[in-house]
Structure formats: C-alpha cells, structure tokens
C-alpha cells in the first residue's frame, strides 16, 4: 500500500496506522535535531494556516505559531471574540470560507463533531488542537518524550494514566498506546473510566499491534513497574468549579504523590502532565480550591513535591508539542 501523508487531516489518530504514527514521530525527531543544530530547512514557505481557538491555550497556540514560523508559514489566530464563528456563522460555512483562503486549519474547542465538520467541508487539511474527546497532537508529544527518556523499545515501554480517565487525555493515551503496541494502563474510579465503546475499539487495535491494555480501579495493579506516570487536571476546561466536591472525593486516592511514585517499584520512573497543572495554590484556581479544600493546598492532581522533583519531565513534554506539531504540518502541507 502506498505511503503518503500529504493533505492528511489529524483528527484523533483513530484512522492513522501504526506506521504513519511512527513516521510522524521520526519526522518530529529529525525536525527537533535540525532546530537544535541550526540546520532547519523551511518547507512551508508561502503556506497560510488558520488557527481557530474556541478554548484558551498557551502551549497549543504557541507550538503551532512557532512551528509554522520556523517552517516559513504564516498564521492567523481566530477566536470567538474576533470572528463570527458560532455567533452569526456556522462551522460548516466557516470551513467553506477558510478553506478557500488557507492551506490548513487548526481547531481547538469542544465537540469532536465540530473538528470533523471542519474536515468534511474545508477542502484543506484540518488539525485537531484539542476537543473534549481527543488530543492527538499532545499524544505525539507524549510518545516522543517517552522515547527520549526510556532506552527500551517502544513496544516494551509501559505507562499509566491515573485520575479522571473520561477526558481527552485518558481517551487519547489509551488510543495511542493501543495503536503503537505499548503497555498502557488506565487507572481511575469506576465512574471516571473511559467509555466501554472506546475501550472495545482500542482492544481491537491492541490485537493488531500487540499492545497490552489494562483498565482498572486498582492503583497498585496499574502502577506496578511502569516507566511513566501520567495525570491531568481533575476538572477540565469548561466544567464549573461546583463539580470539584464530588470529583475530589472520588479522585483523592489517585493523586500523584511521592508515595504513589514509589509504589511503581521503578527508581527511574518519570512523571508526565500535559499542563497546566495544579501542583500548588499559587494560581487563582489553585487558591480557590485550597480555600475550600485545605488538604489540597500542596497540589491537586499532583503534589508540589513530585512536580518540582527530577521525576517531572512535563516541560520537555511541553517543548515537544512544537516539534511534533511541526512534523504534522510538514508531513501534510509541504
């Protein structure tokens, strides 16, 4: 079968093969080395890329913008406050307009159906910068980071995602591990585990790739021997703070603490987080939570002690957003 990534969307990684994902990871490493060495060649000169952000962003916006500029492309940042999107114009109509002006479109927002609609009607490649269901660019960065910090073959790397596993991070880490033949474990209270339909789909991918999938409430079973511990915030963007009470009660045993990291039994275990992280009470939201729940003053989903330790590789993970996003755009648009 011919191998061609040109003009490809990146919507969830569901429709990407293992070979295609590994190609994007290899290209990411090549582009990262070239940037560090000062030998990067611009492959996107003359390209224009629209960046639609219905949800706020630091890493995703900066990664797309710097990656595009490095490669010679121009970007336009579009949010609901500066456009007609969602107010006077549907996403379908927006797609048909932007597709005539831009070579590619990034979307960060809410339902997966919205980014799918963009892809259906734009006529140009569409890249998912985050939806409620999936976060594919983050997944490429996460796997690249794990490869860089583990000398095992990809198929032997094990990781656990612990916390609220119904969100885009839990879904996406399950999906990419299944696609790449990794040892992936999802650990959460029963009420916060991924949907059964997603687990079933990923189990089918695992049979093809040789991946080992574990979905469990049992913390000790999930963390035993893992190379990496992933987590994410307990309340995602757009959810009201009122939901914190019941979520904290459910998730407190799943907080990433020094003790939990020790329970892995791996002295080389690393901590990963897509960021931003509530690891202390120095942010506005962190202070609000600490005032109501004093036991979380030293961190919510992860404690300050773990976050500020050498175990934490979240900032290298964040940098890799840029290199992997650059690879996605170069593969599709160059």
UniProtKB/Swiss-Prot annotation:
SUPFAM superfamilies: Aspartate/ornithine carbamoyltransferase. HAMAP family: OTCase. GO terms for cellular component: cytoplasm. Pathway: Amino-acid degradation; L-arginine degradation via ADI pathway; carbamoyl phosphate from L-arginine: step 2/2. Its main location: cytoplasm. It comes from Haemophilus influenzae (strain PittGG). Pfam families: OTCace, OTCace_N. It is found in: Cytoplasm. Its EC number is 2.1.3.3. One of its GO terms (molecular function) is amino acid binding. Carbamoyl phosphate binds at residues 57-60, 84, 108, 135-138, 274-275, 321. The keyword Cell membrane does not apply. Belongs to the aspartate/ornithine carbamoyltransferase superfamily. OTCase family. Coiled coil: none annotated. InterPro entries: Asp/Orn_carbamoyltranf_P-bd, Asp/Orn_carbamoylTrfase, Asp/Orn_carbamoylTrfase_sf, Asp_carbamoyltransf_Asp/Orn-bd, Orn/put_carbamltrans, OTCase_ArgI. L-ornithine binds at residues 168, 232, 236-237. It comes from the Bacteria. The keyword Cytoplasm applies. It catalyses: carbamoyl phosphate + L-ornithine = L-citrulline + phosphate + H(+). This is Ornithine carbamoyltransferase. Reversibly catalyzes the transfer of the carbamoyl group from carbamoyl phosphate (CP) to the N(epsilon) atom of ornithine (ORN) to produce L-citrulline. GO terms for biological process: arginine biosynthetic process via ornithine; arginine catabolic process to ornithine; citrulline biosynthetic process.
